[in-house]
Amino acid sequence: MQESIQLVIDSLPFLLKGAGYTLQLSIGGMFFGLLLGFILALMRLSPIWPVRWLARFYISIFRGTPLIAQLFMIYYGLPQFGIELDPIPSAMIGLSLNTAAYAAETLRAAISSIDKGQWEAAASIGMTPWQTMRRAILPQAARVALPPLSNSFISLVKDTSLAATIQVPELFRQAQLITSRTLEVFTMYLAASLIYWIMATVLSTLQNHFENQLNRQEREPK
């Protein structure tokens, strides 16, 4: 038992370094995924059916296939076409593309939940559709989308462990490498799992804080 604890202490710098990569991939994947997801959400709401169909096709592909397969096609498959990417950029692209598919549906549902009468009211005072979206619809939709998007981000933190399969030195990969040297399988994977749990707990606490702040603002008299 004492030896296992000492091993975890000795391995902690490597695990924390891996956790740093995990957070980088999570934040980057969520940021770029939200940007692309917003574009896809607008496409899903477009009155032009080919645009809607293209967005639905993209979302169907990335939600209907395993993330690990998407990562493999980017890292191992693209070199067949002369496109070679390092592990971290490959993981960032794969996570962003996958996140975008889920974020798009969340954002689309949030935008659609806003009363249609607000579009008419904004148009009646001379606001353009983009001004209406930016000033009236998006702030309200953001409140609706925050809880599911926060949950998606927490899931993304855990999903980054799949990047270990394409040699990204994130938290799970570091645990694998240490395990291969020490053969302490249970100890190292337990330590890695505890770090994932701590990160998820901190993020969940922040999510609850922001939601409470928003709810408090809504209850305050205008």
UniProtKB/Swiss-Prot annotation:
Keywords, in A-Z order: Amino-acid transport, Cell inner membrane, Cell membrane, Membrane, Transmembrane, Transmembrane helix, Transport
Topological relation to the membrane, as annotated: Multi-pass membrane protein
Xref: Gene3D superfamilies: MetI-like (1.10.3720.10)
InterPro entries: AA_ABC_transptr_permease_3TM, ArtM/GltK/GlnP/TcyL/YhdX-like, MetI-like, MetI-like_sf
GO biological process: cysteine transmembrane transport; diaminopimelate transport; L-cystine transport; sulfur utilization
Free-text activity regulation comment from the record: The TcyJLN system is inhibited by L-cystine, L-cysteine, DL-2,6-diaminopimelic acid and L-cystathionine, and is stimulated by D-cysteine.
Pfam assignment, any one: BPD_transp_1
Single GO MF annotation: L-cystine transmembrane transporter activity
Transmembrane intervals: 23-43, 65-85, 183-203
Name this protein carries in UniProt: L-cystine transport system permease protein TcyL
Organism: Escherichia coli (strain K12)
